[in-house]
């Protein structure tokens, strides 16, 4: 796993709220992950202007919130190219019915912002492979899912966890197609 760590959801939520930014941690991570998966390079600082335009009417962010966004960007960049294929989604945690509804909403928001990030990065989705198009269609369908108050909440919580795992797989498929690949070592191997 990467040395780069994601910020804690509650602390980041407070930071974004105190900065009066109209985005929550799940949305921010989804947006940045979508941008990376769409081909954004870490060397390309244009992501900041795109995020400012998308979230804050083009106005810059306070230094602390911007540093947290960069922390997410670095962590997700490392996770997306890691050979362990492990992604950590920045989602709220908690117990009980209310927490389950909050999690389901955050999952939908994460997906919607991921798809927006793909678009902001300029990914050419029209020329995507069949696998990438299927992954995108799956994400679009999963973004519409919700929790039914009248069904068994424990069962729905389990299904939501399966959805989250499928989201990760879809993200990896899209990043494999459009994302910037890690630089290959060009030095010859000495035996």
From Swiss-Prot:
Gene3D superfamilies in UniProt: YgfB uncharacterised protein family UPF0149, PF03695 (1.20.120.740)
HAMAP family associated with the record: UPF0149 (MF_00346)
PANTHER family: UPF0149 PROTEIN YGFB (PTHR37528:SF1)
Name used for this protein in its record: UPF0149 protein VC0395_A2053/VC395_2591
Classification of source organism: Bacteria, Pseudomonadati, Pseudomonadota, Gammaproteobacteria, Vibrionales
Species annotation: Vibrio cholerae serotype O1 (strain ATCC 39541 / Classical Ogawa 395 / O395)
Family: Belongs to the UPF0149 family.
NCBIfam families: PRK01736.1, ygfB_yecA
GO cellular component, one term: cytosol
């Amino acid at each position: 796993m990467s040395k780069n760590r994601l910020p804690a959801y509650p602390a980041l939520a407070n930071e974004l709220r105190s900065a009066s930014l109209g985005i929550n941690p799940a949305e921010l991570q989804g947006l940045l992950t979508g941008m990376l998966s769409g081909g954004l390079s870490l060397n390309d600082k244009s992501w900041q202007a795109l995020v400012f335009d998308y979230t804050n009417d083009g106005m810059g962010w306070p230094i602390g919130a911007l540093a947290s966004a960069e922390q997410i960007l670095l962590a997700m960049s490392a996770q997306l190219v890691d050979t362990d294929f492990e992604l950590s989604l920045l989602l709220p945690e908690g117990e009980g019915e209310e927490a389950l509804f909050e999690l389901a909403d955050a999952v939908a928001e994460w997906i919607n912002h991921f798809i927006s990030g793909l678009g902001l990065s300029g990914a050419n989705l029209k020329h995507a492979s069949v696998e990438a198009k299927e992954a995108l269609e799956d994400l679009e369908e999963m973004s519409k899912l919700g929790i039914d108050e009248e069904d068994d909440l424990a069962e729905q919580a389990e299904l939501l966890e399966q959805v989250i795992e499928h989201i990760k797989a879809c993200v990896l498929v899209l990043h494999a197609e459009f994302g910037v690949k890690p630089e290959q070592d060009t030095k010859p191997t000495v035996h």
